[in-house]
Design a protein with these regions (language model features):
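Short, glycine-/aromatic-enriched active-site segment of Class I SAM-dependent methyltransferases
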Residues: 214-234
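A short glycine-rich, Lys/Arg-flanked "PGG" loop and its adjoining helix->strand segment in the class I
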Residues: 192-207
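Conserved SAM-binding loop
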Residues: 104-105
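C-terminal lobe and adjacent flexible extensions of AdoMet/dcAdoMet transferase-like proteins
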Residues: 250-391
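Conserved alpha-helix/loop element of class I SAM-dependent methyltransferases that forms part
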Residues: 32-66, 77-84
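Short alpha-helix
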Residues: 236-251
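A short acidic, Gly/Pro-enriched loop at the edge of an enzyme's catalytic core
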Residues: 133-141, 152-177
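Conserved SAM/SAH-binding beta-strand->alpha-helix loop
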Residues: 97
Length: 391
């Protein structure tokens, strides 16, 4: 069996394995998952049989969401999500494999008729490059064949045009990005771009809900070179802690491990591979402004440290910028903090930059009614950098 030596080799190995999986059920690609049975009756059996996932990110969707499913395959998660988000929501599946797309697109009208609304569409693209619509590019290539360097340059120009004028998925256009055991199929060289693309397409306040396979230690090179193991969701798996760190590097906050299987799915060369589901949020970018707000961390831990190294002692009023105040008021932090508004509201148009240094001046009338701020009478600051949008 030939070994993998490039991202193209990885893509070919995955395409061949999943094209076969579209034609005939591949049990080795399945990781047992308990789905909500209420949503399965409307889905054709040929789709259910070709479920090659390892989790159920649809459990974390809400009515009205616009959802993007990366590596949508036969469409099972999309069709479940369609029912969860309802007629007011929308679901977009993206996959590169023509055989899987044909299966999903063929099932879509059947599901729509059974549930009473049609809010699912399937698009062709690479999940690490959500700007290029490959159906549109295929159509262009049909009448503009590439035969030499000159026509290759024309192809590259068309790709740039598609990115700018007709992106497959536009910036900030979805509420939730889900994926079910697919990120590990992307070549290592393209994984950083993949996370950047997830971040790009999410709206501010949106979330990524990713189920995938992770490993206890970094996968060694000899396993990464095995096409059978790569297309089987093993060789491309993130090491467990590195998977969480990838969300942070991409700019997400509130990275939350919501499910981790205690029993490994597989053990290869002594390395455990198991399913996890992670939720991460977008929206901490931007400058920090001082609206005279504070929060109290309620416990149970003595002190907590957030992703930007802001420190919150239990029970101690802590000044925060307006952006952080908003973030701590919603998931995944809702309920962990008591929110303290100032007695006199601050005009956002004139609010100063949030000063992270200790203060020695007396409090102003904009201070919260029940506390005074920072060093003056014991109110601490969470810290950070006001000018770079630290929090």
């Amino acid at each position: 069996m030939p070994s993998l030596s490039s991202p193209t080799d990885v893509e070919i190995a995955v395409a061949q394995r999943y094209s076969a999986g579209a034609q005939e059920v591949q049990p080795a690609l399945c990781c047992p998952v308990d789905y909500d049975q209420r949503f399965l009756a409307a889905i054709p059996e040929e789709v259910l049989e070709r479920d090659y996932g390892c989790g159920d990110p649809s459990r974390y969707l809400v009515e009205g969401d616009t959802v993007l499913d990366l590596g949508s395959g036969a469409g099972k998660i999309c069709f479940i999500a369609s029912q969860v988000v309802g007629a007011a929501g929308r679901v977009i599946g993206v996959d590169l494999n023509d055989d899987m797309l044909a299966l999903a697109r063929g099932a879509a009208p059947v599901v729509a008729q059974r549930i009473g609304h049609r809010n699912v569409e399937f698009r062709k693209g690479r999940i690490q490059d959500l700007a290029v619509d490959l159906d549109a590019l295929d159509g262009w290539l049909a009448s503009h064949p590439v035969t030499d360097v000159s026509t290759l340059a024309t192809l590259e120009a068309e790709q740039r045009r598609l990115r700018a004028e007709q992106p497959l998925v536009a910036d900030g256009s979805v509420d939730a990005v889900v994926s079910n055991c697919v990120l590990n199929l992307v070549a290592t060289e393209h994984k950083a771009q993949l996370f950047a693309e997830i971040f790009r397409v999410l709206r501010r306040g949106g979330r990524a809900v990713i189920s995938d396979i992770v490993s206890t230690v970094e996968v060694p090179d000899h396993l990464r070179a095995d096409p059978e193991l790569w297309s089987g969701c093993i060789s491309g798996a993130y090491q467990e802690e590195a998977f969480l760190a990838a969300f942070e590097r991409a700019g997400f906050y509130g990275v939350h491990l919501v499910k981790r299987d205690s029993t490994p799915w597989r053990v290869v060369d002594g390395i455990e591979f198991r399913s996890v589901t992670v939720i991460a949020y977008k929206g901490k970018q931007g400058e920090c402004r001082d609206h005279g707000q504070a929060v109290i961390y309620c416990g149970p831990f003595k002190t907590v440290l957030d992703d930007d190294e802001h420190v919150f002692p239990r029970g101690v009023p802590t000044a925060v910028c307006a952006k952080s105040f908003e973030i701590y008021s919603r998931q995944p932090y809702a309920g962990a903090f008591q929110l303290l508004e100032p007695a006199v509201a601050v005009d956002p148009a004139t609010a100063p930059l949030f000063d992270c240094a200790p203060q020695t001046a007396p409090p102003t009338p904009t201070e919260p009614a029940s506390v005074v701020r920072r060093a003056v009478s014991g109110l601490t600051t969470a810290g950070g950098n006001a000018t770079t949008g630290c929090c």
